């Protein structure tokens, strides 16, 4: 059945084989899911916690529909275009692109078939001239404001992407798709892309301050535990310490000068062969004694363990037998992870 309907606290829109679901998800927040499949899925991995019970105000009329949760209002046109407003001030926060027919424009949401029953997904929003975007994890371009940038939604060495952005217009936006993709924060449009995903899934919140937006975000995704004091201190790392004696000499110098040192990091090539996951005992003859001396100086030790394996490593046969090598395949293959348990057996402590 096409058109609008209310389902509990959710607003549902169906048209042209697309289903869109808007529902309250935490204070002043909405979760939006959309799919070209017959039904929306609830079994997909993600970052959002189950929300506390929230009462939404839903209105359905001939001219469209709306759903309000606290200070966040979403208005949906008869064609399915969504606008988000601050319900207290009336400010338009974010609006999807218009449907332009019949000129071949894809509209605000598009679905292109991919392998495995998934879709290449795109969601398009209109730009705001003086809007600024912050967040998105750890990027390497050196910019505070991401406006005008194209950001990969994937991890690389030195790049840790979190698909959550805070806008200067007073909203936060989480792209809730565990898929490789990108976001284009352009001057002509804002475009979110998932290369292969089951459905569109995002979460939006509004706040009077950045702190309130972040508070809504952590309420929705989970609060991190409080860090111990040493974790917030000074960390010393070098590429690389070649021996136990070299590392201890650095820590002793800090101690002699009265400089506070919280953590010292033992990075790569402290092993004999890559994948052995234990120290090279010729250069690191007494790891346990080293750690005791460091802890007596108030210094914690972090050891970098790499998941790559030399074919000559003592762990190579067991990894091969367990099917642990990654390979390009269109089929889902079982994989057993042995790195952590093997490292523990090597007694990194």
Segments the model singles out, each with a brief description of its role:
Residues 1-231, 237-239, 243-252, 263-269, ...:
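N-terminal accessory segment at the very beginning of proteins
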Residues 53-54, 282-284, 330, 342:
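Short capping/connector residues at structural and topological boundaries
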Residues 184, 242-243, 274-275, 312-315:
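Short, solvent-exposed polar/charged micro-motifs at secondary-structure junctions
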Residues 250-257, 275-296, 314-315, 333:
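Catalytic cores of extracellular degradative/oxidative enzymes
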Residues 259-261:
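A structural motif
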Residues 271-278, 346-349:
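Short, basic, glycine/proline-bearing loop/turn elements
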Residues 307-349:
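Active-site-adjacent "subsite" loops/lids of carbohydrate-active enzymes
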């Amino acid at each position: 059945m096409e058109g609008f309907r209310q389902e509990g606290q959710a607003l549902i829109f169906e048209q042209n084989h697309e289903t869109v679901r808007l529902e309250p998800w935490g204070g002043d927040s909405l979760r939006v899911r959309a799919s070209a499949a017959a039904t929306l899925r609830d079994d997909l991995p993600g970052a959002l916690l189950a929300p506390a019970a929230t009462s939404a105000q839903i209105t359905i009329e001939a001219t469209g529909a709306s759903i309000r949760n606290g200070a966040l209002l979403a208005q949906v046109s008869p064609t399915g275009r969504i606008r988000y407003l601050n319900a207290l001030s009336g400010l338009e926060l974010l609006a999807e692109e218009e449907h332009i027919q019949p000129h071949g424009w894809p509209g605000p949401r598009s679905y292109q078939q991919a392998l495995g029953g998934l879709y290449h997904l795109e969601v398009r929003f209109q730009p705001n001239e003086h809007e600024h975007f912050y967040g998105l994890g750890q990027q390497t371009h050196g910019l505070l404001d991401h406006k005008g940038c194209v950001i990969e939604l994937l991890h690389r060495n030195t790049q840790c992407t979190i698909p959550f952005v805070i806008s200067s217009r007073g909203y936060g936006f989480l792209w809730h798709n565990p898929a490789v993709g990108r976001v284009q924060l352009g001057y002509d449009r804002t475009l979110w892309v998932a290369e292969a995903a089951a459905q569109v899934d995002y979460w939006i919140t509004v706040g009077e301050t950045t702190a309130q937006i972040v508070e809504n975000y952590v309420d929705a995704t989970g609060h991190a535990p409080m860090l111990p004091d040493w974790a917030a201190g000074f960390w010393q790392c070098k590429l690389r310490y070649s021996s136990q004696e070299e590392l201890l000499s650095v820590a002793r110098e800090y101690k002699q000068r009265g400089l506070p040192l919280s953590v010292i990091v033992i990075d790569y090539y402290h092993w004999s062969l890559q994948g052995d996951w234990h120290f090279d005992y010729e250069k690191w003859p007494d790891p346990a004694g080293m750690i005791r001396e460091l802890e007596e100086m108030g210094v914690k030790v972090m050891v970098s363990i790499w998941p790559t394996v030399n074919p000559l490593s003592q762990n190579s046969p067991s990894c091969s037998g367990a099917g642990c090598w990654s390979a390009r395949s269109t089929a889902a293959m079982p994989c057993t992870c042995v790195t952590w348990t093997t490292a523990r057996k090597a007694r990194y402590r």
